[in-house]
Each structure stands twice: as C-alpha cells, then as structure tokens.
C-alpha cells in the first residue's frame, strides 16, 4: 500500500485516489523569463519520478504543470531585451523543454499558460466577489479577503504563521488585512514597457499570481484533485492562497494530498534567481551527463533539503558509474528475475521502499545490492543468472528514469566529460598564474604561459581593466 506524506495533515497517509485507478496531479511550473536553474530541475525530477512510479503501479495519471507567461519579471526582462513578452516567453518555453527533455523528464499531459486562461481567471474572481470573499481596493486592484476564510494558512500552520514581510505592512491604505492578496492587478497599457493587459469588469488589468493556478487547475480538473505538488518554498504564501481561493469558491477540499520537494541549497541558501544564487541546468550540462544530474537530484529523500556542490555531483557520477559497470557485458532484455526468486525478492524490496513516500535513497540501496550480486554472478561465471539479475536491475532503475543508456556509451561519455573538465581546470589555472605574473611585472613568465595556452588552442584577450577573456581558436 502506497503511503504519501501530506503537508496538509503533517503525516503519511494511505493513498486512495478519488476515482479508482485514476489520478489527477497538478504541479506548479516556472515563470518563463529566463533559463531554468537546478532548483527547478530538482522539483520537476522529483515529480517525474513520482508520476513514473504511479504509472508503473497501473494508475492512469493525468499530469498538469502550468506555465506562468505573464508577470512583472517577464515584462521587465522583455523591455530590457527590446522584445515583446510573447517573444520572450515563447523562446524561454522552448529552452525549458530542451533542458527538461535532456534530463529525461516526461512532458505533462497538459501544460496550460496563464495568458490562454484569462477568461477562466476572470470568471473565478467574479465567483469569489459574488460570495463576498473579494473586494475592490482603493487603487482599483481586486483583493482576496483572508478574514473570510475561517482557517486561512492551514497548510503552513496558522498557529505559527509565517513572518509578514515589512514591505507588505507598509501598504495600510490598500488592504483591509495585511495578509490580503491580489486577484486582479489594475493596469493601463504602457507603450514604453509593452505591458500586456486585458479587459475585465474592473477595467484593464492582469491576474495576480495565486489565482492563476486555482483557475487553470479548475478549468482542467474541476473542483478536486488527488495530488498538488511544488517546491517547499511555495507552501506560503502561494499554496496557502490557492487553498483559500479554491475552497472559498467551490466549497471543496481542493487537493486531497499536498506534496512538497525540499530546497536545493547553494552556499547554505536556497538556489534562487531572486537571490542571484543559482546555476542553470544548461551550465551543469556542460560538465556532467544529464543522467548524473538526475541521479544526484534524487539522491536525498524528496522532502529533504539537498546541498549542491561539485563534490556531491562527482560522488553521484561515481555511484551511477558503478551501476553501469555492473551492467557491462550483459544483455538485460529478458524478463527480470535472478533465479531462485532473487529477482522477485529485490523487486518486492524496491517496491516497498517506493511505497514508503517515494523513498528514492532507500530504493537506490536496493539497486546497489542488485549490482553487487550481479558482479558476483559474473565473477563466478553464472552467465544466465547474471543476465536475469541485470534485467532486474535495469527494470527497477527504469521505473524512476535511470539506466536507460547503453553502458558502454555512458561510460565513454563520462570519461570524455571528465577529461574535458580536467582540461578546462588546467586552462583556468594557467590563466590565473599568468594574471599573477603580469601583476608582478614578470613579463617573460606571462609570455611563456600565453605561448603554452596558444599551443593548447586558446586565444587570450587582455581587457583594459586587467580582466582576461579567453576562447578556443
């Protein structure tokens, strides 16, 4: 029996779908104004493994991951780039798909855009107004009134409410309650910024952040879904506000289970564009195979925080390499079994770990037990048993999107990446030594380093500020 930790109840619960055999799941997507970073990748890989496992269990899963394609950050970035918001978002959506496809992340069944659901959003707001859960602020914005929701903040725990940011408290004339939030933002078309806006009963404007997910979710799935997911940074205010809007509008529980993935940390802080503390997926793909990144991002339990650093990625690559080495010289195309019911034992153990709130670290330990057994069988020359064990290893790893490559091809790829990374590190070290030599007026040494780099195919460009740029010839 599958058990899932529910953020709403703060405990693991037996998973019982609303409709037998079918699951409706909604995961909050990205705001498409820039390339996705590794923190986004962690959330999407977590839920990708969840969806793969649910489908393996025989469920018919309908998966929605939204796209926020209108937002202040989008408007600002489009203006800076001298392009329309639509040009920017269309380009970033394509880039997002390239990155997520590279990580073997399945595409959702539906990928709704905010700009394609404005009418639905307006109707949703009208319903909240008619039920007296929303009001017009003095500046023309439509606000949700949190005082009309008897248990507002239930997800983040209203007995210990999150700290209200100072900038919220500094707007006393706009909100009836400092926690009230925008449903519809009144705007006027700004030719300079090319700011998009839509007609509504309240004048020109655009939707607030929180209403978008409630409305799009409702338009696809109706009043209630099985699972709502996202990063733990969305618990408050986004998911608390989604619950408030949806429960007040339709008087249902909205989502039966709330799942949240832990944050990816860089320098002990959340990996985030707003903190300028991130690496893009594209950055990391230059140095590591996509499957290594996927393996790393599932190496901690999905609810736990995960620390990013180069050593942890290298360790993940070494671990994944061990599994592929075990698969070497096998042909795992036969049915998964290890003989003497070994295969069945490992399969049962793997399933029990995944049934315990999708415990991928424990599931990994089963994969390594299989790899160890497989290596022993190969050493002892039990080729038929080894083939069965290899099939079991590949079968189980495939459930969570791993070991889908040819072992020889994977091992050659990471060797090439490793050599390239070492070459890159050597170049950086030589350039740093040359910069020190120049600062110390050691011109002969600086020139000899330049010549060495030239032989390696590197062209240097010394800038007027003392910064040296380089590129391959």
Swiss-Prot record:
Cofactor note: Binds 1 zinc ion per subunit.
Chain location of the short sequence motif 'HIGH' region per the record: 30-40
Keyword Ribonucleoprotein attributed: no
Compartment annotation: Cytoplasm
Residues binding ATP, per UniProt: 273
InterPro entries according to UniProt: Cys-tRNA-ligase (IPR015803), Cys-tRNA-synt_Ia_DALR (IPR015273), Cys-tRNA/MSH_ligase (IPR024909), Rossmann-like_a/b/a_fold (IPR014729), tRNA-synt_1_cat_dom (IPR032678), tRNAsynth_Ia_anticodon-bd (IPR009080)
Positions of short motif 'KMSKS' region: 270-274
GO cellular component, one term: cytosol
EC number: 6.1.1.16
UniProt record, GO biological process: cysteinyl-tRNA aminoacylation
Swiss-Prot/TrEMBL keywords: Aminoacyl-tRNA synthetase, ATP-binding, Cytoplasm, Ligase, Metal-binding, Nucleotide-binding, Protein biosynthesis, Zinc
Entry GO MF terms: ATP binding; cysteine-tRNA ligase activity; zinc ion binding
Catalytic function, reaction form: tRNA(Cys) + L-cysteine + ATP = L-cysteinyl-tRNA(Cys) + AMP + diphosphate
Positions that bind Zn(2+): 28, 213, 238, 242
Cofactor: Zn(2+)
HAMAP family tied to this protein: Cys_tRNA_synth
Assembly and oligomerization: Monomer.
Family, as annotated: Belongs to the class-I aminoacyl-tRNA synthetase family.
Protein name: Cysteine--tRNA ligase
Origin species: Blochmanniella pennsylvanica (strain BPEN)
């Amino acid at each position: 029996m599958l058990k899932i930790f529910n953020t709403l109840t703060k405990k693991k619960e037996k998973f019982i779908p609303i409709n037998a055999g079918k699951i409706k799941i909604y995961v909050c997507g990205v705001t498409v104004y820039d390339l996705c970073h590794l923190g986004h990748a962690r959330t999407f890989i977590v839920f990708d493994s969840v969806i793969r496992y649910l489908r393996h269990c025989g469920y018919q899963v309908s998966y929605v991951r939204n796209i926020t394609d209108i937002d202040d950050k989008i408007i600002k970035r489009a203006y800076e780039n001298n392009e329309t918001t639509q040009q920017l978002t269309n380009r970033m959506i394509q880039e997002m798909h390239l990155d997520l496809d590279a990580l073997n992340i399945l595409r959702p069944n539906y990928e709704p855009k905010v700009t394609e659901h404005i009418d639905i959003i307006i109707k949703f707001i009208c319903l909240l107004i008619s039920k007296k859960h929303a009001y017009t602020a003095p500046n023309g914005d439509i606000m949700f009134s949190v005082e009309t929701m008897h248990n507002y903040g239930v997800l983040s725990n209203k007995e210990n409410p999150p700290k209200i940011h100072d900038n919220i408290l500094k707007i006393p004339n706009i909100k009836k309650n400092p926690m009230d939030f925008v449903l519809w933002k009144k705007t006027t078309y700004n030719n300079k910024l090319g700011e998009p806006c839509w007609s509504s009963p309240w004048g020109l404007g655009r939707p607030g952040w929180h209403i978008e997910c409630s409305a799009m979710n409702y338009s696809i799935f109706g009043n209630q879904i099985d699972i709502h997911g996202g990063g733990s940074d969305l618990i408050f205010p986004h998911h608390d506000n989604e619950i408030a809007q949806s429960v007040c509008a339709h008087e249902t529980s909205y989502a039966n289970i709330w799942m949240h993935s832990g944050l990816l940390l860089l320098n002990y802080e959340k990996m985030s564009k707003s903190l300028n503390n991130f690496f893009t997926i594209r950055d990391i793909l230059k140095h590591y195979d996509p499957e290594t990144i996927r393996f790393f991002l599932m190496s901690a339990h999905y609810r736990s925080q995960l620390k990013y650093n180069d050593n942890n990625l290298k360790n993940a690559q070494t671990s994944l390499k061990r599994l592929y080495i075990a698969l070497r010289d096998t042909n795992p195309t036969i049915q998964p079994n290890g003989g003497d019911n070994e295969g069945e034992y490992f399969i049962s153990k793997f399933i029990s770990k995944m049934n315990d709130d999708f415990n991928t670290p424990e599931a990994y330990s089963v994969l390594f037990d299989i790899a160890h057994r497989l290596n022993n069988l190969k050493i002892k020359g039990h080729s038929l048993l080894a083939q069965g064990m290899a099939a079991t290893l590949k079968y189980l790893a495939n459930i969570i999107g791993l070991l889908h490559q040819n072992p020889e091809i994977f091992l050659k790829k990471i060797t090439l990446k490793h050599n390239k990374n070492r070459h890159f590190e050597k170049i950086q070290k030589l350039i740093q030594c040359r910069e020190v030599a120049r600062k110390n007026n050691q011109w002969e040494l600086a020139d000899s380093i330049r010549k060495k780099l030239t032989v390696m195919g590197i062209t240097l460009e010394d800038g007027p500020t003392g910064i040296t740029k380089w590129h391959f010839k």
